[in-house]
């Protein structure tokens, strides 16, 4: 269906994360039980919900899974890891130390000690998710990266753990896995931060443990938005929309263009390509969540995109680079038809863990900085302290904090 811009504007403006109180109540009970009972509760929930007790998978099993992979797939995993590493090594992460009046001001940058990575289970093994989360953490210098994935862990996930350089891997899933990582049990160490996507129970658990540990964000269904002009290929546009639509029925694929003829050709192409797509029914449901939008011009298309704040924004334009300055809100941007979002899912370089549900308005994609913390250091000389103490005391008294002011008065 082709929408007018005004038909979707209000919908785009209302976007945000929503949470099911029934799910949160269930998850809260799981978290409390694991926090209080440790491994006993962890195993109980794992048996009841996944059919297996929790176990740590030894590294020899990872190596064997890697060696059993098809040679071409091994090569693809290695290439993906190399590109992810290279991309994130470019990210600035150094602190500074500046001399000032006989003293110093400094900023220390330190990696987190221990990070938990959640890799969902299900019918499709998410090898790429493991690479896209573990590799940036290791580039940042995280000492120990612990992977959690539901039992039985797919051999492809084990192989990816070997390639990515993870440190430990537990066969555990769901809210109970998040609880174990957040609180620690006899077998599972407590981590400093939990990253990675999951179902609504995992997302609810991450939300509830935030504050006990850090989290990367709260992921909703995947979404893609393409802005296209008349130079774009309807065949490629339809394929790119379906690539995201097949993720799940709640995915949102959108195409924005001022060219009605292009939108009509894409609509016809979608019908044609759906005929032999294995996940056609899922994709059809997702296409109903998104749609094709006719805009007045490209300026209006970019205004709508910034309002929507998509996880993925593709610019299928004859000359996309000059339009990059118009992008304010997006998890990741893909320039031109030669840079499809599907490449970003696997091997382009940046992590595919990106903000959804409009949270790209205030949050970026997973990166090295998510595994670092900044510690400011103040070391002033007596002279500098004396010079600043009077003004500092004035500010303290303006806030009604006399104890602060007296502490500073003693330095004058």
From Swiss-Prot:
Listed InterPro entries: Ald_DH/histidinol_DH (IPR016161), Histidinol_DH_CS (IPR001692), Histidinol_DH_monofunct (IPR022695), Hstdl_DH (IPR012131)
Enzyme class: oxidoreductase
Needed cofactors: Zn(2+)
GO cellular component, one term: cytosol
Residues that bind NAD(+): 118, 176, 199
Positions with a binding annotation for substrate: 222, 244, 247, 312, 345, 399, 404
Protein name: Histidinol dehydrogenase
Source species: Thermus thermophilus (strain ATCC 27634 / DSM 579 / HB8)
């Amino acid at each position: 269906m082709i929408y007018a811009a005004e038909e979707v504007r209000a919908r785009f403006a209302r976007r945000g994360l929503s949470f099911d109180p029934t799910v949160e109540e269930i998850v809260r009970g799981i978290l409390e039980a694991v926090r209080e009972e440790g491994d006993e509760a962890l195993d109980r929930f794992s048996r009841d919900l996944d059919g297996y007790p929790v176990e740590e998978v030894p590294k020899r099993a990872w190596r064997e899974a890697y060696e059993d992979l098809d040679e071409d797939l091994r090569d693809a995993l290695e290439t993906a890891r190399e590109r992810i590493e290279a991309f994130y090594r470019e990210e600035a992460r150094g602190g500074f130390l500046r001399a000032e009046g006989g003293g110093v001001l400094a900023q220390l940058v330190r990696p987190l000690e221990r990070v938990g990575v959640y890799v969902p289970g299900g019918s499709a093994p998410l090898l790429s998710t493991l690479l896209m989360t573990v590799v940036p953490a290791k580039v940042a210098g995280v000492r120990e990266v612990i992977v959690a994935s539901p039992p039985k862990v797919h051999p492809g996930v084990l192989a990816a753990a070997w390639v990515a350089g993870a440190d430990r891997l537990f066969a555990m899933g769901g809210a109970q896995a998040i609880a174990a990582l957040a609180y620690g049990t006899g077998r599972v160490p407590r981590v400093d931060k939990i990253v990675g996507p999951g179902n609504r129970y995992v997302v609810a658990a991450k939300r509830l443990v935030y504050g006990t540990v850090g989290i990367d964000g709260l992921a909703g269904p995947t979404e893609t938005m393409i802005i296209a002009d008349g130079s774009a290929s309807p065949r490629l546009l339809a394929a790119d929309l379906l690539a995201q639509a097949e993720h799940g029925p709640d995915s949102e694929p959108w195409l924005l263009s001022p060219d009605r003829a292009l939108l009509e050709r894409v609509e016809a192409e979608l019908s044609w390509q759906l005929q032999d797509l294995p996940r056609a029914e899922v994709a059809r449901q997702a296409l109903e969540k998104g749609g094709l939008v006719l805009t007045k011009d490209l300026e209006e298309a970019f205004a709508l995109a910034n309002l929507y704040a998509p996880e993925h924004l593709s610019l299928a334009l004859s000359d996309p680079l000059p339009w990059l300055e118009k992008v304010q809100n997006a998890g990741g941007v893909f320039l031109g038809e030669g840079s499809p979002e599907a490449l970003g899912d696997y091997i382009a370089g940046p992590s595919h863990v990106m903000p959804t549900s409009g949270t790209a308005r205030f949050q970026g994609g997973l990166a090295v900085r998510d595994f670092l913390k900044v510690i400011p250091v103040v070391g002033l000389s007596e002279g500098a302290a004396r010079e600043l103490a009077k003004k500092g005391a004035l500010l303290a008294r303006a806030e009604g904090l006399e104890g602060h002011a007296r502490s500073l008065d003693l330095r004058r």
